[in-house]
Regions:
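Short catalytic/signature loops enriched in Gly
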Residues: 47-122
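P-loop NTP-binding/switch modules centered on Walker-like glycine-rich loops
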Residues: 1-74
Length: 122
């Protein structure tokens, strides 16, 4: 936590700071923007404000991460994680996504979503 406070001070002085972490709650206290990665692919870019409520997040994995935070109940993300070296087609989260359709297996373009971007057809 002290390291994150130091990063925040650096950012307040105008320095660019990139934080890579699995501790989403801690990151949300420190950063302005979040890029969500899954299986080596960026799937959503959002402001910290978008992480205030689940419904402002667009990608199902981002929403699952939101629900998995301790303050939201530690909800388990079901399914099997892909092997990152596999040649994944389409959305890498599709095999674990309750809302996935056949379209999710194709190319997924970036689209504007709120204050960020998302790679999801939903």
């Amino acid at each position: 936590k002290r390291a994150m406070e130091h990063f925040r001070q650096l950012a307040d002085m105008g320095a660019a700071v990139l934080v890579i972490t699995h501790d989403l709650e801690l990151a949300l206290e420190t950063v302005d923007r979040v890029q969500v990665f899954y299986a080596g692919h960026t799937i959503e870019d959002a402001s910290v404000d978008d992480f205030e409520r689940e419904e402002t997040l667009r990608h199902p994995y981002s929403r699952a991460l939101w629900r998995a935070m301790p303050k939201h109940g530690f909800h388990y993300i079901g399914g099997v994680q892909p092997y990152v070296k596999d040649n994944l087609q389409g959305c890498p989260f599709a095999p674990r996504c309750d809302m996935a359709s056949r379209e999710c297996q194709g190319e997924i373009p970036w689209k504007v979503s709120g204050s960020g971007y998302v790679r999801c057809i939903l």
